[in-house]
């Protein structure tokens, strides 16, 4: 790790001394981006999170900003080195509720937008989520974990006064007892609360040994709630079987609105208070199914699916302010689109420039909302800059309102990103991919190439900003990233080709992508490199077990042994039941055949492992198995462990820099050098 940090500092010093026009590692601290836009009830203004980096504390921070829907009068609502978010504008547009997180914890606040007065509503022991204003403006609802009594095993005698005994044993009787990014989970259940918006004690309105941690929506008369939870026997072993319930706040009665096998969530009440929308599907125990959009009466009767022919997952559906249709987003061929559907099922696409939520890798995804006059706002981005705020009205053309990173990115030469297609060598299936070439790319040169593979595996890359891709290109590499079979945004059949079959022919897809780029020229075929994280780490380890074509590889936060993974990952009940047709003790060879460790005897490629020390999604012992196997075989290898990092290995700015620095150093050690070997 020390050599990685020294390399980071060397990069920083070199970038400063030479004033490079390319993106430099320290520029990560200068990036700003937008998130979570919220449109006011009259459509006149938008509240959003303005995200930035804190170089002294090495943290991502966020404040709330306000901007008029025409782009004027941008100004901060909150300031400081804190994390303000989850903004919800009150029904009259005069107040905004939000959470503010500091080192002391996260609490709920209400701020008056005209005068700036701020009321701290809560002093709670746990963070809150899913804020929702009542239509009359008198209440706020939210989710929060309520502690339960921890199990014990045996009793100890009382320690003498002043004695310093060891901590008592920790007893686990839950299937999910720790989670990535959170560590060991406290004993308890997520419940729904309501609190007076003017101040007062929160009141718990759900109960039982069940989690109620999904969306919350108020009834039109502000006397009831629609909540989401898993209220079934053995709920923790059936993690996708959520339902929607109605809670009467006067009497406390709870009534099921949905009752089927599948993940119903995202409930919202129509502006006239007469109908519901939500998304979900009938669960068939597949590793991927597209989410579908439903509308129904308030009691769940007369349910119908609005877009049965849309072979894409519906995300974040919201009622239009006139109640005549629904806005939603969906991923399509790597891009994230905003669309409107009428209650008769007519689909209208509005924009395909949504994105920019991430900084590290070019994943699809976005955030949007709708307010009065059907004014919508969304996070807008592309491959050359992270998220800004765009807005429009109805189904009209949106306009980008902010340019948060202009001061930095207008003064950096970034790598342009080109979209391409290739036929897979396995079956001729069309595979979409993108190529980022250095800003000073010379077609007559011969460049090293990095194949960067996304995780998931059911996710998608697209033409979105990626600091990692830009830093690799700034170091002189051509970077290629693709959506092999199994990726989302191409329909259910494309994603389901790897169901109980991962990794498999996705290998052929990726090799075909590399072949296509090499065939175009300007690539040195003797300097090919491969890396990927999570599911991309699985495929990277699989690739070096199938071919010695790549000069070096970096396997980040992988699964190496499916038998150990499905029984020790944080969400074991899901992985064990949805990713394999049988349990590992019932079909050990089925798990082993798909494990990269089964191919380690073939590996000759110098391969580095890189994982966060607090990763509970693909735990460190997965990387350690591959590392030790390579060591025993005499293959050049190294194990980079990121202290304090979870599966989101680059969540802190310096961790992102350290990850990129380690990968570049490993490739440079093995002939990459990031240099263009001129053909002349």
Regions found by a protein language model. Give the residues of each.
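Active-site-proximal cap/loop segments of hydrolase catalytic domains
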Residues: 468, 481-680
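Blade-terminus and WD-like Trp-Asp/Gly-His loop motifs, strongest in beta-propeller folds
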Residues: 38-45, 86-95, 131-139, 216-224, ...
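Beta-strand-rich domains and repeat architectures in extracellular enzymes and scaffolds
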Residues: 26-62
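Multi-bladed beta-propeller domains
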Residues: 19-34, 59-60, 67-83, 100, ...
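Cap/lid segment of the alpha/beta-hydrolase catalytic domain
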Residues: 232-233, 284, 404-526, 533, ...
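Predominantly five- to eight-bladed beta-propeller fold
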Residues: 61-62, 145-195, 228, 238-243, ...
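Hydrophobic or amphipathic alpha-helical targeting/insertion segments
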Residues: 95-154
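Beta-strand C-termini and the immediately following turn/loop, strongest in propeller blades
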Residues: 47-56, 96-103, 141-147, 180-186, ...
């Amino acid at each position: 790790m020390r050599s990685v940090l020294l390399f980071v500092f060397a990069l920083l010093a070199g970038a400063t001394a030479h004033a490079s026009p390319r993106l430099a590692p320290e520029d990560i601290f200068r990036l700003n981006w937008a998130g979570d836009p919220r449109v006011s009830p009259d459509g006149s203004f938008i509240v959003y999170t303005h995200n930035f980096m804190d170089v002294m504390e090495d943290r991502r921070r966020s404040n709330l900003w306000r901007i008029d829907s025409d782009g004027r009068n941008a100004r901060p609502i909150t300031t400081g080195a804190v994390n303000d978010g989850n903004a919800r504008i009150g029904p009259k547009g005069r107040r905004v509720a939000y959470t503010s997180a500091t080192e002391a914890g996260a609490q709920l606040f209400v701020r008056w937008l005209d005068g700036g007065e701020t009321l701290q509503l809560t002093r709670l022991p746990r963070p809150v989520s899913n804020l929702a204003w009542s239509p009359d403006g008198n209440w706020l609802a939210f989710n929060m974990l309520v502690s339960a009594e921890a199990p014990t095993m045996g009793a100890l005698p009382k320690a003498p006064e002043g004695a310093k005994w060891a901590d008592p044993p920790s007893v686990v009787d839950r299937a999910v007892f720790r989670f990535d990014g959170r560590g060991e989970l406290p004993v308890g259940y997520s419940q729904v609360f309501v609190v007076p918006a003017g101040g007062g004690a929160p009141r718990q309105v759900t109960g039982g040994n069940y989690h109620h941690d999904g969306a919350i929506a108020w009834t039109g008369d502000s006397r009831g709630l629609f909540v989401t939870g898993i209220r079934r026997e053995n709920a923790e072993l059936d993690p996708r079987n959520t339902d929607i319930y109605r809670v009467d706040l006067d009497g406390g009665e709870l009534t099921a609105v949905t009752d089927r096998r599948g993940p119903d969530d995202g409930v919202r009440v129509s502006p006239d208070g007469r109908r519901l929308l939500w998304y979900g599907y009938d669960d068939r125990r597949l590793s991927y199914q597209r989410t579908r959009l439903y509308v129904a009466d308030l009691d769940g009767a007369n349910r119908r699916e609005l877009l049965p022919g849309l072979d894409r997952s519906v995300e974040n559906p919201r009622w239009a302010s006139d109640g005549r249709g629904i806005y939603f987003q969906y991923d399509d061929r790597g891009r994230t689109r905003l669309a409107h559907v009428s209650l008769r099922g007519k689909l209208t696409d509005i924009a395909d420039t949504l994105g920019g939520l991430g900084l590290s890798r070019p994943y699809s995804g976005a955030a949007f909302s709708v307010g009065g006059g059907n004014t919508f706002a969304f996070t807008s981005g592309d491959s050359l800059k992270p998220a800004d705020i765009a807005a429009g009205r109805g189904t009209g053309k949106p306009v980008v309102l902010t340019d948060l990173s202009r001061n930095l990115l207008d003064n950096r030469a970034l790598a342009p990103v080109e979209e391409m297609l290739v036929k897979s060598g396995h079956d001729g299936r069309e595979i979409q991919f993108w190529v980022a070439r250095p800003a000073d790319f010379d077609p007559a040169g011969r460049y090293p190439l990095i194949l960067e593979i996304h995780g998931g595996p059911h996710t998608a890359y697209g033409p979105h900003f990626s600091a990692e891709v830009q830093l690799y290109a700034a170091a002189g590499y051509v970077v290629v990233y693709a959506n092999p079979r199994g990726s989302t945004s191409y329909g259910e059949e494309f994603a389901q080709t790897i169901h109980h079959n991962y990794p498999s022919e996705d290998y052929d897809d990726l090799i075909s992508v590399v072949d296509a780029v090499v065939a175009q020229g300007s690539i040195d075929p003797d300097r090919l490199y491969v890396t990927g994280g999570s599911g991309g780490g699985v495929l990277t380890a699989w690739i070096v077990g199938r071919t010695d074509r790549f000069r070096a590889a970096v396997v980040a936060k992988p699964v190496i042994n499916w038998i150990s993974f499905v029984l020790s990952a944080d969400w074991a009940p899901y992985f064990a039941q949805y990713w394999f047709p049988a349990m590992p003790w019932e079909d050990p060879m089925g798990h082993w055949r798909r494990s990269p460790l089964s191919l380690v005897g073939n590996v000759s490629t110098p391969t580095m492992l890189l994982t966060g020390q607090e990763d509970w999604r693909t735990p460190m012992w997965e990387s350690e198995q591959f590392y030790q196997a390579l060591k025993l075989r005499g293959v050049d290898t190294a194990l980079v462990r990121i202290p304090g990092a979870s599966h989101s290995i680059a969540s802190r700015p310096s961790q992102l820099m350290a990850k990129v620095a380690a990968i570049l150093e490993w490739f440079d050690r093995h002939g990459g050098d990031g240099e263009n070997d001129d053909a002349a």
